[in-house]
Regions:
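Solvent-exposed loop/turn segments connecting transmembrane beta-strands
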Residues: 9-19, 40-50, 70-79, 89, ...
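Hydrophobic, lipid-facing positions within transmembrane beta-strands of outer-membrane proteins
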Residues: 18-22, 49-53, 63, 77-81, ...
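Histidine/lysine/aspartate-rich catalytic loop segments that bind and position anionic ligands
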Residues: 77-105
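Outer-membrane beta-barrel initiation region
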Residues: 1-14, 25-26, 147, 165
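Residue-level signature of outer-membrane beta-barrel architecture
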Residues: 1, 26, 57, 71, ...
Length: 173
């Protein structure tokens, strides 16, 4: 079972890009798992619930991949593809470059998302593994919104691209 939660806290008390998933995970080979479950988008925009079906695993050269397809109750479809690589600097320090792409089948004005390639996030995180299951991290991320998604951002007086400093805690149990 996987519980995934991601979002950005805004200075004015809101949440942006709040994405929460509960997924059942099953190994289908030595290197890959299939995941099925639900995703809920909760933030200052319109809430949306999705059914999720995905694959995650290890590609050659130890690149971790995650690809998930989503279908909502109102006929919207989406896909999220992510790649990252753990570069061990020492036994505890890990540098992790990563890239995530989000694609949508339809424009969704309530969520300020356009069809096609909606966003790309690329960055690098440095984490210190206190234990393998608990590691604080700090990093820098480039976030780009494209097409109609970028136009929605500009209508709200937001930038279509941004570079952000991120920090958090990575944990699993």
């Amino acid at each position: 079972m996987w519980l995934k939660s991601e979002g950005f806290a805004l200075g004015k008390g809101g949440v942006e890009d709040g994405r929460h998933e509960v997924l059942y995970n099953r190994a289908i080979s030595t290197w890959f798992d299939v995941q099925v479950g639900v995703r809920t988008d909760l933030d200052s925009g319109t809430s949306r619930q999705w059914a999720a079906l995905g694959v995650r695993g290890m590609l050659p050269h130890f690149v971790e991949m995650e690809a998930t397809a989503y279908a909502s109750d109102n006929g919207h479809f989406a896909a999220r593809i992510g790649l990252h690589y753990d570069l061990r600097l020492t036994q505890r320090w890990v540098l992790q470059p990563e890239i995530d792409l989000n694609v949508y089948s339809k424009t969704d004005p309530g969520r300020h998302v356009g069809s096609g390639l909606a966003s790309l996030d690329a960055g690098v995180r440095l984490r210190y593994e206190i234990t393998r299951k608990f590691a604080p991290y700090v990093g820098v991320t480039y976030s780009g919104r494209y097409g109609q998604t970028a136009r929605f951002a500009r209508q709200e007086s937001e930038a279509a691209t941004a570079v952000q400093v991120v920090f958090g805690i990575r944990s699993w149990f």
